[in-house]
């Protein structure tokens, strides 16, 4: 401590331990003050739309990011995203902020789980540094030999063993063999090894005149086996210093004369050992491992055919073999059906006996080797295989029926050269622990973790890999801990769900070992079964324990209970939210008065989602048989109609594959609606005539335009425009309903084109979004704003919340508008403005706007609605409102199928389909189906275990 400086007070250290936010006013936040303890796990909770994300992301993260960007030079700032300063008085004690959101982080088709977690980068280095190249011919390791290697090989024999040091005859283009041997004679070399016999060069020239007159380097050059070898020295094995020195000189001479090759022949066995200073073996020249060799983003490593994508346009296996439960004999090869093309199948079956090919085995049970025979052929089968069939079609393309058949089976398929590995063939020759990099990236992460945990390396390799292995194993353990053990490193990033992407980013953050940072996470429990939540909490605590502050926007009860500090935003949503209802450790919630906070009421049990008194009966259903897409194991599933069906299971068990990739797409195909091809299944049967339409309701934004809003989506604004156009002033001025549209020329402000704001780009500062000077943010021309209904113009109406608008239009008996708006209120969105831009809505709000649209349509035709995790972003209280809306759909004669982890939804289902028992390869089976009570009674699987607690609560 320096003299003259006061000792730090307790108050100072207390403040240093906290992040202080004063007067936050972003979006609906009402000038709130928040204190967040540093190095803690903090959960921000509250109703959907209450202002949680406004505090966590739009205030804390935005300011942390802005401060980081501001610290850079003006030159660097022009290349970075420009950040707004959030509306608040001040934020003190804010560490560098990192946001991990629910967005799929990469749309790049080259990005994989391995590259995004950086594990693949470490694997590349590992294989480049300690990988051993194995010859595919002999299975021996390929090495660049040194004289020491040759000496060690010789000394491996017992003392006194006779051997010769040999070199291949150096081939000089344009010279005859005789001329080359004459040069050796001049150099003092006098003998050759001819098939193990030692002969003098003069004798060989006399005995083989024809061979000696052959010109080297010409096409008529004899095979390498017929060439004699040049004898450099004759020795016997001895560990004597002089003998070893002589051997070393001879070996160096052999390498020089043999152009990098040397041979040892031992007697009396005449065994021949080959050594080379070149990286070659078995007549193949190999490339030495470098990290670029294993990079599919580098031209040095990427497969030349698919250029590192792993997929090419070719013959699609799924189109050729649509039903893998059939055998070759039963007609699994679709293009070999019919009278004419069936001859190919018959001929293949006849010839298959030559190699014992199992023609009665289902296609999905065939080994990779057996599939290669079927697709690429075998010498014993002649030219009968699938590839040869399509080559025949290509040769005869002048026939229109062949061109049509080729087009029918063409699609994106796995690259035949690299078999989906994305790498050149040389990469597969390099092994670590007996496995190639391709083998490792195709293993599930849980298996890969075990592989590295038990990896045995030589002392030298272990020393080289000492810094690489901990980086790889720690990241693999983190991925397993966040419930992603079923993924492979080769899985493309753009096929991951939002929840999976977020947890991969979380594992990457843990692996990076950053400390002293602020991590802000948006519902990391999304897509996570209750079984995995405890492991997620452990990971969040690890992130905290290394010295970070972790702020989590979350609704999951287990995570709320595990928090060090809770901030409850509310009390309601929208304009009725934006306040701190209570903040403190979990134990403090008992002091909050009942009815003040929905969160506290649910935690204490005062408010809860009740289990239905009875389950709906059903007698109509749609059945899928033999579903084998992705990891599904040929399961038979029945989806009841006219009830609420919930599909449950741990992460990676196959829920999305079953419902979205197979069931939904199969229904689309049944209705002849264009869409992606469904995953593999044998048949779909049942009461398909009982439904007339199908709708898949996801969380994607309701509109891409900034002018898109809830009122336009549910068609309520159409009624409002008609109402405004019917007013007397509109009639006098000749206004039509289109005049009141901000998406069309006519009535909208020509300056801002109906946006109400003008964006001004600033080179080194954040873009300025200024109120339009022409319309003052009201979107329309003045003459349009002069038209009023009951004292309100179109801008005033768009500024109303849904609740206010319903009250206003009900008062003035405009029931057509109320009818369109009511469903938005019913799904719990009464707090949002009519004209609120869809860009500002959360994923959960977008999904509920879509639900409201379907509720407002009142379709007479029975429709099948499929929801993908509709509880995302929803508080306990919001889930209750959502369930009422879903039940309203069912009461109108529709059917509802939900992919969901939330047990409050599962306990309210009429029918549960539980997949599992684990994720990835260990999933894809039907664990249980039936009512929640029947699933619990069966007692199998994780869902039954956790659901039992909910039903008994």
Where are these regions (language model features)?
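Conserved phosphate-binding elements of NTP-dependent enzyme cores
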Residues: 2-953
């Amino acid at each position: 401590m320096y003299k003259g400086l006061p000792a730090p007070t307790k108050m100072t250290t207390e403040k240093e331990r906290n992040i202080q936010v004063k007067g936050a006013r972003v979006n609906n936040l009402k000038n709130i003050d928040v204190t967040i303890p540093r190095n803690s796990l903090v959960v921000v909770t509250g109703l959907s739309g209450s202002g949680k994300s406004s505090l966590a992301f739009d205030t804390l993260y935005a300011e942390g990011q802005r401060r980081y960007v501001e610290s850079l030079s003006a030159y660097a700032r022009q290349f970075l995203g420009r950040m707004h300063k959030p509306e608040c008085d001040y934020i003190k004690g804010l560490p560098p902020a990192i946001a991990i959101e629910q967005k799929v982080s990469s749309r790049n088709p080259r990005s994989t789980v391995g590259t995004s977690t950086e594990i693949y980068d470490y694997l590349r280095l590992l294989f480049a540094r300690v990988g051993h190249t194995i010859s595919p011919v002999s299975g021996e390791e390929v090495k660049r030999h040194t004289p020491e290697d040759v000496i060690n090989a010789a000394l491996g024999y017992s003392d006194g063993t006779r051997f010769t040091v040999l070199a291949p005859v150096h081939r000089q283009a344009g010279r005859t063999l005789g001329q080359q041997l004459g040069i050796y004679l001049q150099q003092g070399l006098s003998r050759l090894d001819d098939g193990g016999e030692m002969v003098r060069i003069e004798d060989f020239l006399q005995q083989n005149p024809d061979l000696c007159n052959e010109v080297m380097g010409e096409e008529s050059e004899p095979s390498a086996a017929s060439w004699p070898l040049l004898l450099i020295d004759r020795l016997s094995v001895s560990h004597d210093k002089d003998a070893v020195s002589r051997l070393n000189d001879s070996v160096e001479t052999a390498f020089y004369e043999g152009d990098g090759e040397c041979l040892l022949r031992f007697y009396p066995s005449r065994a021949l050992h080959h050594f080379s200073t070149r990286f070659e073996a078995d007549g193949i020249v190999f490339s030495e491992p470098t990290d670029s060799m294993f990079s599919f983003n580098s031209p040095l490593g990427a497969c030349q055919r698919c250029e590192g994508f792993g997929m090419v346009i070719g013959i699609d296996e799924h189109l050729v073999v649509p039903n893998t439960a059939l055998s070759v004999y039963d007609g699994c090869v679709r293009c070999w059906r019919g009278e004419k093309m069936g001859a190919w199948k018959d001929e293949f079956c006849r010839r298959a006996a030559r190699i014992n090919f199992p023609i009665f085995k289902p296609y999905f049970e065939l080994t990779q080797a057996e599939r290669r025979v079927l697709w690429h052929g075998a010498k014993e089968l002649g030219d009968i295989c699938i590839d040869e069939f399509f080559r025949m079609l290509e040769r005869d393309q002048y026939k229109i029926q062949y061109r049509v058949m080729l087009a029918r089976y063409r699609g994106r398929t796995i690259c035949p050269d690299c078999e989906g590995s994305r790498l050149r063939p040389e990469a597969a020759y390099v092994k670590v622990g007996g496995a190639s990099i391709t083998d490792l990236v195709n293993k599930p992460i849980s298996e890969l973790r075990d592989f590295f945990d038990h990896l045995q390396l030589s002392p030298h390799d272990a020393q080289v890999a000492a810094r690489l292995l901990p980086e790889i194993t720690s990241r693999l353990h983190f991925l397993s801990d966040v419930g992603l053990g079923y993924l492979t490193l080769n899985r493309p990033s753009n096929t991951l769900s939002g929840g999976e992407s977020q947890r991969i980013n979380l594992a990457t953050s843990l692996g990076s070992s950053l400390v002293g940072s602020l991590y802000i996470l948006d519902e990391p429990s999304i897509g996570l079964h209750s079984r995995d939540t405890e492991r997620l909490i452990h990971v969040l605590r690890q992130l905290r324990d290394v010295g970070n502050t972790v702020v989590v926007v979350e609704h999951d009860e287990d995570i709320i209970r595990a928090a060090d500090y809770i901030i409850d935003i509310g009390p309601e949503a929208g304009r009725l939210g934006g306040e701190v209802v209570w903040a403190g450790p979990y134990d403090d919630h008992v002091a909050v008065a009942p009815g003040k906070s929905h969160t506290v009421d649910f935690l204490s049990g005062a408010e809860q989602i009740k289990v239905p008194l009875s389950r709906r009966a059903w007698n109509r259903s749609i059945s899928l048989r033999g579903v084998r897409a992705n990891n599904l194991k040929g399961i038979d599933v029945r989806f009841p109609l006219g009830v609420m069906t919930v599909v449950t299971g741990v992460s990676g068990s196959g829920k999305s594959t079953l419902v979205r990739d197979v069931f939904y797409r199969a229904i689309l195909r049944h209705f002849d609606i264009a869409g992606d091809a469904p995953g593999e299944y044998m048949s779909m049967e049942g009461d398909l005539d009982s439904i007339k339409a199908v709708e898949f309701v996801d969380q994607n934004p309701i509109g891409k335009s900034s002018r898109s809003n809830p009122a336009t989506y549910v068609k309520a604004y159409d009624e409002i425009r008609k109402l405004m156009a019917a007013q007397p002033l509109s009639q006098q001025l000749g206004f039509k309903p289109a005049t009141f549209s901000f998406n069309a020329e006519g009535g909208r402000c020509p300056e801002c084109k109906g946006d109400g704001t003008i964006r001004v780009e600033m080179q080194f500062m954040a873009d300025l979004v200024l109120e339009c000077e022409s319309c003052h943010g009201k979107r329309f021309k003045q003459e349009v704003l002069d038209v009023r209904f009951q004292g309100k113009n179109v801008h005033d109406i768009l500024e109303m919340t849904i609740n206010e608008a319903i009250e206003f239009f009900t008062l003035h008996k405009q029931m057509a508008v109320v009818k369109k708006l009511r469903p938005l209120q019913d799904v719990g969105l009464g707090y949002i403005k009519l004209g609120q831009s869809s860009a500002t809505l959360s994923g959960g709000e977008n999904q509920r706007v879509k639900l409201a649209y379907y509720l407002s349509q009142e379709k007479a035709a029975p429709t099948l609605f499929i929801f993908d995790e509709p509880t995302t972003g929803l508080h306990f209280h919001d889930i209750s409102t959502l369930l009422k809306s879903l039940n309203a759909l069912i009461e109108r004669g529709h059917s509802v199928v939900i992919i969901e982890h939330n047990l409050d939804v599962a306990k309210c289902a009429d029918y549960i389909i539980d997949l599992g028992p684990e994720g990835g390869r260990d999933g894809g089976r039907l664990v249980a189906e039936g009512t929640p009570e029947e699933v619990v009674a069966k007692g199998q699987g994780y869902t039954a275990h956790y659901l039992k607690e909910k039903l008994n609560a």
